[in-house]
Amino acid sequence: MLLIDGKKVAAELRQRVKNDVDALVRQHGRAPHLAVILVGEDPASQIYVRYKEKACEEVGFVSRIWRLDGGIGQCALEKLITELSSSEDIDGILLQLPLPKGLDAQRCLALVDPKKDVDGFHPENVGRLSIGLPCLKPCTPFGVIKLLEYYGLSPAGKRAVVIGRSNIVGKPMAMLLSAASPFGNATVTVCHSRTPDLAAVVREADFIVPAIGKPKLITRDMVKPGAVIVDVGMNRLPDGKLCGDVDYDNLTDVASAMTPVPGGVGPMTIATLMSNTVEAYRWRRQPPDCPI
């Protein structure tokens, strides 16, 4: 079985971003500037933001984190996002999700300048992704595609099953896998909590992308020999260990290629965030042919 090593691929992508940043500083006189908004004390969000801050330092970005009290009002949060969107000094904006109860994430995301939407969640970027126009792509699905590209695992003409229909992973993942591109062109099925006989659907798949957050949901009997599995799930077991949505240890002699958890998709999410921020920096200076 081929181990799809997200740590290795992410490290190479971060190095390319660092090289790009060095060139951009020489050309324009400053590095990309990423603004991160963290609301509340969610432990997982705190960890993710620290990882992102460290990655920014490694590639040479300027980053600033706005740490806001969980009791902040909707109007105050929207005011900050609007100010950052209009600032000439900010190239990318990341609103760390989830937000505390009482705050409307969709309203906030819609206020981010689409050209600075490095998470790819703004409705304009989502719409452009759906019709194949240049856009900033959601980081985790984009990271999955980057892994497939690196290892030459093309889903073109194959059956792909995405398990989960979230706006962050499932839906954009399905769009990227079915897109008319070298590492798209798959026939995609999206499964969710109302899908009858999930095992039967997954068993037909050549590419399996679980992103639902249920430990070891995908078992040996659900996977046909030779399938490629990219596990987006991240779950903490009672003993403190992390695992994905796939029963990894019992599938190594069934799958032809598979990501580990941790060390698979997670590092790619942060690396593609860095890549998106460089893209946003460039687009603010020279928009693509179909500008955002």
Swiss-Prot record:
GO molecular function: methenyltetrahydrofolate cyclohydrolase activity; methylenetetrahydrofolate dehydrogenase (NADP+) activity
E.C. no: 1.5.1.5, 3.5.4.9
Keyword NADP applies: yes
GO biological process: L-histidine biosynthetic process; methionine biosynthetic process; purine nucleotide biosynthetic process; tetrahydrofolate interconversion
Binding residues for NADP(+): G164, R165, S166, S193
Entry-linked InterPro entries: Aminoacid_DH-like_N_sf, NAD(P)-bd_dom_sf, THF_DH/CycHdrlase, THF_DH/CycHdrlase_cat_dom, THF_DH/CycHdrlase_CS, THF_DH/CycHdrlase_NAD-bd_dom
Recorded GO CC terms: cytosol
Listed pathway(s): One-carbon metabolism; tetrahydrofolate interconversion
Keywords: Amino-acid biosynthesis, Histidine biosynthesis, Hydrolase, Methionine biosynthesis, Multifunctional enzyme, NADP, One-carbon metabolism, Oxidoreductase, Purine biosynthesis
Function: Catalyzes the oxidation of 5,10-methylenetetrahydrofolate to 5,10-methenyltetrahydrofolate and then the hydrolysis of 5,10-methenyltetrahydrofolate to 10-formyltetrahydrofolate.
Family per record: Belongs to the tetrahydrofolate dehydrogenase/cyclohydrolase family.
Assembly notes: Homodimer.
HAMAP family: THF_DHG_CYH
Protein name according to UniProt: Bifunctional protein FolD
Organism (species): Solidesulfovibrio magneticus (strain ATCC 700980 / DSM 13731 / RS-1) (Desulfovibrio magneticus)
